[in-house]
Amino acid sequence: MEQVPSTGRLVQITVTEGYDLKGFKGDTPVTFIRAEFNQVVLGDSAKITVSPEGSAKYNFTSSFEFNPEGGITLDDLAHKPVFLTVTEVLPKEKKQKEEKTLILGQAVVDLLPLLEGQSSFQTTVPLHPVQGSPLETPRSSAKQCSLEVKVLVAEPLLTTAQISGGNLLKVTLEAAYSVPESFIPTGPGQNYMVGLQVPSLGEKDYPILFKNGTLKLGGEREPVPRPKKWPIANILAPGANNIPDAFIVGGPYEEEEGELNHPEDSEFRNQAECIKKRIIWDLESRCYLDPSAVVSFQKRIADCRLWPVEITRVPLVTVPKGKAGKTEKTDEEGQLSFHGVAYVNMVPLLYPGVKRIRGAFHVYPYLDSVVHEKTKCLLSLFRDIGHHLIHNNKIGGINSLLSKQAVSKNLKEDKPVKEKDIDGRPRPGDVQAPSIKSQSSDTPLEGEPPLSHNPEGQQYVEAGTYIVLEIQLDKALVPKRMPEELARRVKEMIPPRPPLTRRTGGAQKAVSDYHTQIKNISRAILDEYYRMFGKQVAKLESDMDSETLEEQKCQLSYELNCSGKYFAFKEQLKHAVVKIVREKYLKTTSFESQEELQTFISELYVFLVDQMHVALNQTMPDDVQGTIATIFTSSEQLRLFAFEAEVNENFEMAAAYYKERLVREPQNLDHWLDYGVFCLLTEDNIKAQECFRKALSLNQSHIHSLLLCGVLAVLLENYEQAEIFFEDATCLEPTNVVAWTLLGLYYEIQNNDIRMEMAFHEASKQLQAQMLQAQVTKQKSAGVVEDVEERGKRESSLGPWGITNGSATAIKVEAPAGPGAALSILDKFLEESSKLQSDSQEPILTTQTWDPSINQKPSNTFIKEIPTKKEACYERTISFVVDASEMHFIFLRLGLIYLEEKEYEKAKKTYMQACKRSPSCLTWLGLGIACYRLEELTEAEDALSEANALNNYNAEVWAYLALVCLKVGRQLEAEQAYKYMIKLKLKDEALLAEIHTLQETVGFGNPSF
């Protein structure tokens, strides 16, 4: 063999051994292997006798030269395999001059690992039997016959730059469905071809052709998974057509990237893929893209967006016998018909991390003006660039009709090298041929359709033809940040989570908690006692006899047991007792014996009784009247108070409530989010950012914290950080519609149209999936109640921390019409629809999102615009079995309506319900106003006192307290309340005038008198 030129590198293929072989003439045939690559025979092995076990040691090495400058290129290695044909040598018979041979099977070696940077690899490839081969019936071992193959190059074929910057493009053409009715399987043979171009060497375009599609009648769906096939003809063994480990798997239409992926397209596609005629290719073609081609590919996608994929058919020409090596033109050659084009949106390949797009694409008639407008492509692959591709269109091969150079002389051949490539792909250097159509002539060449009219191509549109195409890259054109990197970047940007405060005095804390529970329960029992026997009973306690006290005790015990309060008190105390057992007595395991348990219980009982007495003595000293009860407020109550402070635009008080929540529970993420939203309302963006980042430091996987941090980063123009936050959110929760939408808005700000399109497309996709799931759930639900509950869950998922910035109660403001302010939408609708019937209101109410607290107007405007219909709407709302999302504000609005209409009994009832559900300063104030107007002064004073205890900075509360004191004749208290009212600057002029009038009537209450 000749020496290999210095510019080339030798690729060696060694077949070491074969397994489970057998021949036509027994289980120990004489066989040899022929290696072929690129339609050139690389060599034959020695003749080896197969052992009785079916194995044969060939140790046969063949090679070819890799020379990208003019021989075998990287692209050849990408889409052309090495064929290993095993042939049996039959024994010579008498008077037989030459040996007879029969082909047993063919194996395929994919050289793709060489393009992945490997310099050698070893593999076991199956030996596919030819038709009629004895290998079709496996041996008793039931193993498929195979060959052990090693591939070796002296050094890697790719440089480091090529490995990092290059890419491998795989294009799979599955089928064309719903083809025109004029396509019939009988009559003259037709070659159905599809082609597209991709950048190859720099700016050069490389045609990829798929030829000889099979026209099939409808009747059944194509099976999945089914193997992808090599784009090479004349493969001897049927199984060798299949690319190893490459399958067409299909998938739901909704997950495709094409044009027919909407729910309304499902019926048409099902009919087309089951009933109608189709053309099947199932071919995968590969193309290596060097680094410059990758850059050109990216630039072309960004500039053109749509990629033309042409489809046509040309008649097959049968070669007469004895002229197989000649290329004779006939009258039928060169006739390009049914020239169509599909526009493939390649933009998704520029989305971060996307390596594959697959979908169905409509086929349209090929018209120059339309193609140029959509794709900026001036020339047609079939008609202009490759007009001569339709020549030499003979039966029996997916033939590339451009000439190609012969393989290096050192390759061993047993027949001349043909000037035709059988893979359906021209050489990269050949595509530089000028267009066959003269640039100065408007006259089409023979077989070229008119440029502005294509009646045959129009049949594709009439039939609804579409092709199913897959384009896959080995590496994404735009790398996507890994979740680990995003998490690391987020961790770098947020402050470290502060360490939890070390718990000290566990036993002391447990006893203190027990004291607190005893005090709370004792107050509750005392309140029940007062309710049953009156508050004045304490003054008469010394004058009562023992029988009366015992009778009251029995009545109280009976009431506590019957109402279930006794059981509730025990449950309330249970947790504190458990903490004492664990923290003070260090008992965390079960007792070994019953005696030990009883001893411990006795000891514990004595301790608990003693501590109960200690707590009761602290709570109830001898001078009971001198004790001032401390009102305990929960975190949710503080949150509600903060919202009400926002309503009154008392932001200082609201901030105090939010900070109180943070002091109590600094590790509660929601508290930080609420305070951050409040800071946004007051336009303190720096403080809001601190709060959101603090929340994120507590849980770096919390989606809403990430999104809010991203929003603040945009507001503060920290765009790089914003992208990190939004990307991390979409990575942690890929189905979150809000996260994708915010990411799209961010890219819109950055004028990044491609990524904006990607994010909005994903948001729309996830939203449609959620809507479909909600629709299915709704159909399964039985009755209105389940439907309302399910809607409530969807509402709650929009905002996990409740009402957002702009929160307000109905007493102060009202929301204008707009997205999310459903109550105001309802109000406006009712104002404009005075003839609305009551039976039509319920469906409206059941479909509204009850959130009256966003972007609201001052209460005086709200009061002036209240129509009569609103009262009925709110009454119906509170009568539903399932509550609306914010019933607190519904009660406040309805109570305000009643007060304005002077229906004080209804107002009292409504505010009492509000006080039971979620007591606040405003609910007690409303109840106090209603009681005062009903002349129930004692109840009014009690309610106003409760309101004052919750917020003693409310001027209206002090005003009504002054009115009550004036009515009952308590001069000192009246003057004191009036002073606080003036100090807090009461704004209600009518109420102030009423106080002055009453002061003049009674003659006191105003220190200026």
Curated annotation (Swiss-Prot):
GO CC terms in record: axoneme; extracellular exosome; motile cilium; outer dynein arm; sperm flagellum
Keyword annotations from UniProtKB, A to Z: Cell projection, Cilium, Cytoplasm, Cytoskeleton, Flagellum, Repeat, TPR repeat
GO BP term, example: cilium assembly
InterPro entries per record: CFAP70, TPR-like_helical_dom_sf, TPR_rpt
Signal sequence bounds: none
Extent of the TPR repeats: 498-531, 635-668, 669-702, 704-736, 888-921, 923-954, 956-988
Location in the cell: Cell projection, Cilium, Flagellum; Cytoplasm, Cytoskeleton, Flagellum basal body; Cell projection, Cilium; Cytoplasm, Cytoskeleton, Cilium axoneme
Region Disordered, residue ranges: 410-457
Entry keyword Nucleus: no
Superkingdom of origin: Eukaryota
Biased composition (Basic and acidic residues): 410-428
Family to which the UniProt record says this protein belongs: Belongs to the CFAP70 family.
Purpose of the protein: Axoneme-binding protein that plays a role in the regulation of ciliary motility and cilium length.
PANTHER family documented for this protein: CILIA- AND FLAGELLA-ASSOCIATED PROTEIN 70 (PTHR44314:SF1)
Domain notes: The conserved TPR domains are dispensable for ciliary targeting. The N-terminal half is important for cilary localization and/or binding to the axoneme.
This protein's name: Cilia- and flagella-associated protein 70
